[in-house]
Amino acid sequence: MAEAYIYDHVRTPRGRGKPDGSLHEVTALRLAEVALRALKERNDLDTRMVDDVVLGCVDPVGEAGGDIARAAALVADYGDHVPGIQINRFCASGLDAINFAAAQVMAGQHDMTVGGGVESMSRVGLGASGGAWPVDPHIAIKSWFMPQGVSADLIATKYGFSRDDCDAYAVESQKRSAKSWADGLFKNSVVPVRDINGITLLATDEHMRPSTDMQSLGQLKASFVQMGQMGGFDAVAVDAHPDVEMVEHVHHAGNSSGIVDGAAAVLLGSKEAGEKAGLKPRARIRAFANIGSDPALMLTGPVDVTKKVLARAGMQLSDIDLFEVNEAFAAVVLRFLQAFDLDMSRVNVNGGAIAMGHPLGATGAMILGTVLDELERTGKERALVTLCIGAGMGTATIIERV
């Protein structure tokens, strides 16, 4: 089996996913184009070598629909010969796109592939693509359907994480993100988004709130109380997990991931393809895995999939230097830390989605790039990237510097 190497990665800054966000006037297609074009230009890439473009997108409808990967490859001038495919595994779509691209190379069927993701949440709203799970009783009842926020609160209740625990984690995410930006740790990977006149619309993540503290978070009301109690989802949670007497609602806008716009792209290929292109590999894909998990708890997939991917790679937890666990909700990361008895010094060291935002289909590709940069900066060797996923799933990838 061939090895799949990571040659480079880029991302856009993350804009607030609201009408007043700096990227609201930029379509998902344009965001994807920015990332793909930057990847091509900074590597002087002969796109005749690119066999496919794989992009994750969680709500691929309207202007973000119709196989946005193919459209993005065309507008980014990759050439008529470069195909594209859009994939969707909810919040892990960007990481799964990279895994999909890596698998093509490892199977010997492709020489060079781009993986990544895009989401314009300010223009195509969360949940715009619909689906059977929340509306069809045939699946909703059987799988204990409840909104993700209620599931996050169920995790916090079941595993003993208080409102203060979740808020303290959020404060740390803000501090780490702000410091990483202040120290210039993202400058080599983030490409600004400009308008048609070349004027910069956004060059840094704009969702961050560096002044966040426990006092300011304490003033926010829990977001999912009414949904859980009036909507009946608390009762569903207790039915699914009878060891929980009642759901304690601890999550709110300040300790949950931010709604943002953004895109990312990662260049992968075989050793031979890299040599032909004159590129130096930065890392290799060691292993990747996917699992299904309890759909009621929904967001605990990173724990189980981490065990699976480590076993697949023949590694122990101690073999991993850094972990990126998507900060969908504070309790997701707290449960991961608890399950593996991990120190915070190895997890999300540059901050995460609570501070910088979670552009759904792009996030997996973004955080893989972030941790690769950190491995290089600190001289460390291996990292594990994982995301929780709606409907109860998990995806994980292990990368290793070369």
What feature does the model see in each segment?
Residues 87-118, 156-186, 265-272, 359-380, ...:
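Active-site-proximal alpha-helical scaffold in enzymes
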Residues 22-113, 118-134, 190-203, 296, ...:
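Conserved beta-ketoacyl condensing-enzyme motif
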Residues 12, 16-19, 102-159, 226-229, ...:
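Glycine-rich loop/linker segments at domain edges
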Residues 10-13, 24-34, 42-44, 168-271, ...:
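N-terminal extracellular/periplasmic Venus flytrap/periplasmic-binding protein-like
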Residues 153, 189, 196, 286-355:
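Active-site pocket-lining segment
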Residues 27, 57-110, 131, 143-150, ...:
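Conserved catalytic cysteine-centered active-site region
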Residues 14-37, 41, 59-62, 85-99, ...:
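Active-site pocket-shaping loop/turn-to-helix segments
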